[in-house]
């Protein structure tokens, strides 16, 4: 059987562009351990242009081919694509819509599921409809005096709030507000990232994560891992990726009862199946001191950097990432 031509697409030009490049390197190294794939990695820039790592411009056509601007390079037929793009246009579902249009099989969640999870307002409506408890919130559709008053009222009721751009990556356009006088400026910043904003009650709780993925025909939910931040910080974009980050990650959370651990995993699977996710996800929860479980968010294309939790939790669960990729891809294209 000849190798399949696998397009590894990364970048996107957004706030998480560089993280996407790091994740793509993990995919490259994992795919290289198999003899089933011929891999072409392309970077998508902020202008929507595709190019190779050495700068050759190209395009993905509706004939499922990569055609190069330089006519001396022959067209490259694409059998399968991994859209390793965090944020727009990957996790938003936009690029998946194009793949569907040209009937190109791809890795990861489909367009509607991606869009529903990426928008924090839509996601919360789904969580509630599925009976999965989540953090108390209000949402705002424009920056005006009424929005500021609503947020100030929420602050008065809850004592502290998180203000989040509704349609950005998990830590992009996200601000913790402990001083009421800062609300107007924070809202202005959040609205610069997205047309809708979510204001959530600050939850003082443990931050737990579950890797949920499909493998050998089953939906797998790992034991919860934990993000442990300094008491004066939250898991912001900088805390995730800065070299001097004070945060640490535990692949398996300590001091978690079997009953609570299983309930978190059950909620994660319920959300995965109910929202019709596919292939992979990282589902994040809060656990309060009185054992209240709250779903925080779903990441439909979690990071795969050296510090990322998803690949570590998958491996800790006893699965090999390369074998996992072969299994998922083999459900869609013939690898025999």
Swiss-Prot record:
Highest taxon above the source species: Bacteria
GO MF, one example: metal ion binding
Keyword Hydrolase among record annotations: no
Pathway the protein takes part in: Cell wall biogenesis; peptidoglycan biosynthesis
Any one biological process term the GO annotation gives: cell wall organization
Keywords per UniProt: ATP-binding, Cell shape, Cell wall biogenesis/degradation, Cytoplasm, Ligase, Magnesium, Manganese, Metal-binding, Nucleotide-binding, Peptidoglycan synthesis
Ligand binding (ATP): 154-209
Subcellular location field: Cytoplasm
One CC-aspect GO term: cytosol
Domain ATP-grasp: 124-330
UniProt similarity note: Belongs to the D-alanine--D-alanine ligase family.
Role played: Cell wall formation.
Protein name: D-alanine--D-alanine ligase
Protein encoded by which gene: ddl
